[in-house]
């Protein structure tokens, strides 16, 4: 009887073009996991595809098949033990051979595979392990041809991609390149054991009073033979201290125990409480010998999606531990086109950025991958809620029996792998597949509840989203809410703002509405919306090699923006709102101002609507991140450099925030006339769970002089509604015949004597304003080894003061509006005392 042992097979690999027969064709692989693009670069056979036009020079890789090989040393094995090759991820069509005998053929990138090789390793100590990766691009095209009757309607990439269970963005998306990876993209191990714990999971019931919680812990055993002496000891620890222990004898390959926890420490999203994690361990023992131990971290919490009829239609919001949570956050795409590039440390930095930006939820988008364990662990530990799409995006997927079987296995594997993470609060069937159904005119009768009928329509993928996937979630993670698609709402048209979630793309795409009215375009939960912006100059300098190409309309910059019609759309929003410029640095800044303003107008209004009977339950911007250095909708670029929009969103999501806005006057319509009056509104939003009291001030400041043009408004002892909205002024009026000069509305909020929030509403559009001679002063007032403090003041209102983003330098705030009589403070870490703080503001 042998204890479990494992050997990670990360080194000693070689690879080659499968069709190359010469022995010298083999090249070393630095480390596994890897994909072929990384290994080709390491051997000097491929230029960095992220630089210049190198993506085009890498296209040949997409059409090749590859072979990986390793000499395998047989481990020491006790009698009665089993030897298993475990593959956590093979990308994608893989034929695994051991000593030239096929032991596995796989066709799903999202599954793990296990192969018993005990007998295969019987003879000899050295064995040849080979993995042939067939070309996924060509295989997809072949599969598509085999089903000409299927309607292959889709957005983005080759429609043939839908026939293959591989990350769909590898075929290219409107923010990323076409890089068809292949390889051992997740770990491969050799495991030796007589018995192992194949799974450990829990079912948690939290009493409504939160005073007690019951935890049922389960293990599943995989064994050569189930010895009657086997015992499984379960332990629960909190902060390193054991708080409970129980033992069980396996029955029919499973062991189960029950725990009752008094006064449990709950898991909360950040900003609402501690994200407490308990550690659950299971130890398999026989005759006092520990054979295998498995440990997982869990959180005690409840999570529900509240959908109930109301005056706005039907709600859609999240409730954690009985507390309603406004889910301000972002959508997440894979953080690299070459997935093994992403280290656990890099994942954590991304989630830390979310927390610092006060974002509560991240949506794992359905065209990427089920993320690495370290991603979800970071979300658990840092308190970020996860909206998890299944990996289907922008298409009408086929439903061949063998494909459905693979999809079911994929779903079971990943839901079982992820179900212990308290951060995951919803599984969603797909991204925008119902929108494809609508636009292509595919059959969808919501009233037909017979799944077999769905398979006979020209939209058979409905079977996946409304039958297959929900049944897997119900079996494997029954307390996690399932939503058929994003967007989706009770079978209604996906743009219906009264139900479910919606993707609002009529700013940027669609009708290209003014971003100033973004808040009027939302629904019950806005799970996608966005505006493009250039990344910082240092990022552009990474992929633009020649100085002569460093201008806004250069070919290489166009090439790195994959969005359809991107130049026209960016130009539209720039020309309508700002005085344009042609030098690259200013142009970059102007696009970032537009993105920041767009995100602010959307978030600010939708968060206010949270207080109106949960009219808006959340907003997830598109997108947080990039998969390569590019120009996109990301608010933080590939190198984790925040754009101004990141800071604008963080301010709007402050636990207590003040908002002020005047009604939008559209100057772009035919025969537009100056308004004689304008209405304005003033409000406070709070995510605090208890009432608070504050003071609110509203000043009216001339853009040209900085002077107050009318008497300020001050409200003392304002009772701030908890977890809602406090409307202070809903019928304010600006008389332009009296207050004719352009002026800002500058609001401040004090709580307990400290300024906790600001908001500034500006005359629109900015291009009509004169920003000359602002009298801005940025003064260093203190410095320490790890932090410097700057005070910022101005004589006249300043719009969007942005500090230069540098690696290793962090700002407590940026993209700030500064007004006279309101000195603001910014803390900077990572900046040397002898370094100059560089910045830019509108009109500079």
From Swiss-Prot:
The active site is at 432 (proton donor). Pathway: Glycan metabolism; N-glycan degradation. Keywords: Carbohydrate metabolism, Glycoprotein, Glycosidase, Hydrolase, Polysaccharide degradation. GO terms for biological process: glycoprotein catabolic process; polysaccharide catabolic process. It comes from the Eukaryota. Transmembrane segments: none annotated. One of its GO terms (molecular function) is beta-mannosidase activity. Its EC number is 3.2.1.25. It catalyses: Hydrolysis of terminal, non-reducing beta-D-mannose residues in beta-D-mannosides. Pfam families: Glyco_hydro_2, Glyco_hydro_2_N2, Mannosidase_ig. Glycans are attached at residue 723. Belongs to the glycosyl hydrolase 2 family. Beta-mannosidase B subfamily. Exoglycosidase that cleaves the single beta-linked mannose residue from the non-reducing end of beta-mannosidic oligosaccharides of various complexity and length. Prefers mannobiose over mannotriose and has no activity against polymeric mannan. Is also severely restricted by galactosyl substitutions at the +1 subsite. In contrast to clade A beta-mannosidases, which are likely secreted, clade B proteins appear to be intracellular. This is Beta-mannosidase B. It comes from Aspergillus niger (strain ATCC MYA-4892 / CBS 513.88 / FGSC A1513). The gene is mndB.
């Amino acid at each position: 009887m042998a204890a479990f042992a494992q050997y990670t097979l990360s080194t000693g690999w070689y690879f080659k073009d499968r069709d190359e027969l010469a022995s010298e064709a083999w090249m070393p692989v630095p480390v596994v996991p890897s994909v072929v693009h990384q290994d080709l670069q390491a051997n000097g056979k491929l230029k960095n595809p992220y630089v210049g036009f190198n993506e085009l020079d890498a296209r040949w890789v997409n059409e090749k098949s590859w072979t990986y090989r390793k000499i395998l040393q047989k481990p020491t094995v006790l009698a009665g033990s089993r030897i298993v090759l475990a593959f956590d991820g093979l990308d994608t069509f893989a034929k695994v051979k051991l000593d030239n005998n096929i032991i596995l053929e796989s066709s799903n990138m999202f599954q793990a595979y296990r192969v018993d090789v005990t007998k295969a390793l019987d003879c000899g100590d050295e064995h040849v392990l080979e993995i042939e990766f067939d070309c996924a691009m060509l295989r997809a095209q072949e599969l598509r041809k085999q089903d000409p009757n299927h309607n292959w309607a889709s957005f983005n990439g080759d429609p043939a991609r839908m026939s293959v269970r591989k990350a769909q963005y590898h075929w290219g998306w409107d923010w990323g390149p076409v890089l068809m990876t292949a390889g051992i993209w997740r770990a491969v191990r050799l495991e030796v054991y007589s018995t192992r714990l194949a799974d450990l999971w829990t079912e948690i019931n939290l009493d409504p009073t939160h005073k007690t919680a019951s935890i049922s812990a389960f293990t599943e055993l995989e064994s050569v033979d189930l010895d009657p002496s086997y015992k499984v000891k379960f332990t629960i620890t909190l902060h390193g201290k054991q708080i409970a222990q129980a033992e069980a004898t396996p029955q029919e390959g499973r062991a189960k125990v029950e725990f009752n926890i008094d006064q449990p420490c709950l898991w909360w999203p950040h900003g609402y409480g501690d994200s407490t994690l308990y550690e659950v361990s299971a130890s398999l023992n026989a005759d006092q010998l520990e054979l295998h131990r498995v440990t997982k971290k869990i959180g005690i919490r409840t999570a529900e999606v509240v959908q109930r009829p109301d005056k706005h239609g039907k709600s859609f919001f999240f409730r954690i531990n009985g507390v309603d949570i406004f889910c301000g956050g972002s959508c997440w795409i894979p953080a690299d086109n070459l997935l093994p590039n992403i280290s656990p440390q890099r994942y954590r930095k991304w989630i830390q950025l979310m927390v610092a930006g006060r974002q509560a939820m991240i949506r794992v988008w359905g065209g990427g991958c089920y993320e690495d364990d370290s991603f979800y662990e970071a979300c658990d530990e840092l308190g970020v809620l996860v909206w998890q799409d299944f990996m289907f995006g922008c298409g009408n997927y086929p439903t061949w029996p063998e494909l459905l079987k693979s999809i079911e296995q994929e779903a079971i594997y990943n839901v079982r792998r992820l179900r212990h993470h308290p951060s995951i609060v919803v599984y969603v069937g797909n991204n925008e597949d119902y929108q494809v159904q609508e636009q292509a005119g595919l059959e969808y009768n919501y009233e037909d509840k017979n799944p077999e009928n769905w398979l006979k329509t020209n939209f058979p993928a409905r079977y996946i989203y409304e039958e297959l996937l929900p049944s897997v979630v119900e079996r494997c993670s029954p307390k996690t809410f399932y939503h058929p698609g994003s967007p989706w709402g009770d079978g209604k048209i996906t743009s219906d703002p009264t139900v479910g979630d919606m993707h609002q793309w009529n700013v940027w795409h669609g009708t290209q509405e003014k971003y100033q009215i973004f808040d009027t375009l939302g629904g019950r939960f806005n799970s996608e919306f966005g505006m493009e912006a250039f990344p910082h100059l240092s990022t552009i300098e990474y992929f633009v090699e020649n100085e002569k190409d460093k201008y806004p309309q250069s070919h290489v910059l166009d090439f790195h923006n994959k969005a359809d019609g991107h130049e026209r759309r960016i130009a539209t929003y720039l020309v309508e709102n700002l005085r344009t410029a042609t030098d690259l640095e200013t142009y970059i800044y102007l696009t970032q101002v537009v993105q920041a303003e767009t995100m602010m107008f959307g978030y600010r209004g939708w968060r206010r609507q949270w207080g109106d009977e949960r009219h808006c339950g959340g907003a997830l911007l598109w997108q947080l991140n990039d998969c390569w250095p590019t120009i996109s909708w990301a608010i933080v670029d590939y190198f984790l450099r925040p754009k101004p929009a990141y800071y604008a969103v963080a301010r709007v999501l402050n636990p207590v925030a003040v908002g002020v806005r005047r009604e939008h006057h559209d100057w772009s319509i035919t025969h537009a006339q100056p308004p004689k009056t304008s209405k304005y509104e003033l409000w406070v939003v709070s995510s605090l769970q208890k009432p608070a009291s504050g003071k609110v001030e509203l000043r009216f400041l001339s853009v040209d002089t900085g002077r107050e043009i009318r008497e300020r408004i001050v409200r003392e002892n304002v009772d701030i509604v908890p977890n809602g909205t406090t409307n202070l002024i809903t019928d304010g009026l600006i008389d332009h015949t009296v207050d004719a000069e352009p002026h800002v509305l500058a609001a401040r909020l004090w709580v307990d004597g400290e300024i906790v929030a600001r908001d500034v509403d500006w005359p629109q559009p900015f291009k009509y304003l004169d920003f000359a001679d602002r009298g801005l002063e940025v003064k260093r007032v203190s410095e320490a080894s790890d932090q410097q403090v700057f005070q910022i003041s101005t004589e006249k209102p300043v719009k969007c003061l942005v500090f230069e983003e540098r690696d290793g330098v962090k700002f407590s705030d940026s993209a700030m509006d500064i007004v006279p009589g309101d000195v603001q403070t910014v803390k900077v870490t990572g900046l040397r005392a002898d370094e100059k703080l560089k910045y830019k503001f509108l009109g500079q």
